[in-house]
Every structure is written in C-alpha cells, then in structure tokens.
C-alpha cells in the first residue's frame, strides 16, 4: 500500500468515526449525545421563559416542546421520563461515562 493510499484510508476511517456520533444507552433507550445537549438547552430556555412552561403533571415540560429531538421523544412515553432525562444529562456531562478521557478507568 502506497503512502497516499494509506493516507486516504486514514481519512475515510476518521470521517466514518465522526459521522457515527456518540450515543448514550440508558434503560433501553439509545440517544445521541447531541440530543441530550439540545435537551439541556430546551430546559434552560423553558426555565427562563415562563410563557413556554406548561403544566404537565405526568410529563416533564420539555415533552411538550416541538423542538425536542426525535430520539428523545419515546422517553416521554415512559413513566420514568423525568428521572431518565435527569440521568441522561448527568451521563452527558461525565467524561468517564462517555469514555472520552482515556485516563478514565473502565473505558
């Protein structure tokens, strides 16, 4: 394999890896890290904007938001939606849970 072919193979592998994204699996749900970041943004907006808040006794307020990412919407059907969203936000901010940091044990 020549140097240019090797270089092309490395570039293709890097592109494939970045296209896959980072997924979080929790209690049977698989969501993208970017979706969890969007969830946090939506919740922050709802907290700062009282007119966006709806009174949802059974569902977290964010479940009523049409901007909620598609991969998070099935969680709203769960009785554990609020605790699942909380756990996903916690996981998304923990580098060892996501195995971003190679120094983390168990990664």
Curated annotation (Swiss-Prot):
- Signal peptide start and end residues: 1-21
Keywords on this record?
A: Disulfide bond, Secreted, Signal
Gene name?
GUCA2B
Disulfide connectivity for this sequence is 63-76, 96-104, 99-107
Q: Name one Pfam family in it.
A: Guanylin
Q: Name one GO cellular component term.
A: extracellular region
Q: Mind telling me what this protein is named?
A: Guanylate cyclase activator 2B
MF term (GO), any: guanylate cyclase activator activity
SUPFAM superfamilies reported for this sequence: Proguanylin
Species annotation:
Notomys alexis (Spinifex hopping mouse)
Q: Where in the cell is it found?
A: Secreted
